[in-house]
Amino acid sequence: MTTIPTSTAPTGARASLRRALAALTLAATPWSAIGAAAPAQAIDMVAARWEANGALAFSTQDGFPRGLMTVKGPGAILKDVLFTNGTIEYDINEDGDEDETSGIWFHQRDRATAEYVYLRPAPDCPGSVECIQYGPVVQDHVQWDVYPEYQASAPVRQHGWNHVKLVISGKRMNVFINREATPSLQVGHLESDSPSGQIQLRGNATYANVVVTPDAVEGLAPAPSIDPTAADARYVRHWQLSPASTIAIDTELGLADMLEATALAATTPWEPIAAERKGFVNLSRSHGTPRGAPDLVWLKTTITSERAQTKQVALGFARQVWIFANGAPVYTGKNFYYPAAARTTPLARMTLDNGTFALPLVAGKNEVVMAISNDLRSRGHYGWGFAMRLADIDGLALPGVKPAM
């Protein structure tokens, strides 16, 4: 039987053409679009690959074929890599880091926005819940103190090398320490405003064996985990927010300050602000916190009650609050990080365990006003905001909450 060729080109030439076309098609297609990870990129620890954001030193040593990089604050940015999803691995030695905050920024959009993972080696690791921590970098501040759910124990060695592996997929991240089979830290919702960006190694530490594998997500779903508070109507989620001002340390606010602040709303408009996940009203995201004197903002909302009654309120906050209901003070609270004796449970992190108070309500509309400052009593500012939850909403109407049918 005679075979009729489909092309007049020689067989070898046709095969070469097919291979070339396939290669061009693959090169133009994102690896994620074909359900595969891109090749792993082992990064040389040489000056040509890293942009200094601080002092860097490069060296060689047996057992580290691509070299070592020692960072002496603030960090080193990996050149020519824009990372979205995939795996980042590295070895880190933090023996010279007294602050115990060396780690990695990824999805870095600028010097004020990124995701941050760091280790805190200590003698009580892996038992301590502070051995590994995640915090978003928002408005140039690390919000570690308002996301205690993203701090965990881990098999971290106090001295010498630790291996870190991050798997990032969409809004989720798993972190594995020292090649463990299961993640020490699972982040269900990455909290910065940047879905992709640069990679930066931070702190006072030595790094080696950096490998970046785009789109290698190991089956981790990109969708965020469910917000456990989403269906909880007891959270007071909708407020009006004043412009920010500054407040001197140790200043106490009273009724006269509240009346003056609310009177200014007639000439200086307040803006609406709504709670994020877990009922958190995130002031850092909207206002930021310049270093120096602590910032102060005022917020107000209206709760409508069918009758005169009193409700118990759980409050998580960072750092100092004054609350008024219908023109009368009902609660003041402090959640400083320094001195250690001033820390509320748990370890000055923001949770609903920080404070509780009784909220007296009259029949009809009730105006609740809050002042909150970001006085950490330390050299910088971190997370800033609050979450407020009523014990129940029987007989109440909250802003933004549809009445039960």
Positions of predicted regions on the chain:
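Short carbohydrate-recognition loop motifs
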Residues: 57-74
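Secretory/extracellular carbohydrate-interaction modules
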Residues: 73-138
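Short edge-strand/loop segments of extracellular domains
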Residues: 105-115, 181, 389-396
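Short, aromatic/His-centered strand-loop micro-motif at the edge of beta-sheets
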Residues: 140-163
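Carbohydrate-binding surfaces in secreted/extracellular proteins
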Residues: 157-186, 320-329
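Short, solvent-exposed beta-strand-to-loop segments that form ligand-recognition rims
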Residues: 178-197, 330-343
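An acidic-aromatic loop/edge-strand motif
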Residues: 219-223, 352, 356-405
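Aromatic-lined ligand-binding clefts that engage carbohydrates, nucleic acids, or primary amines
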Residues: 310-324, 368
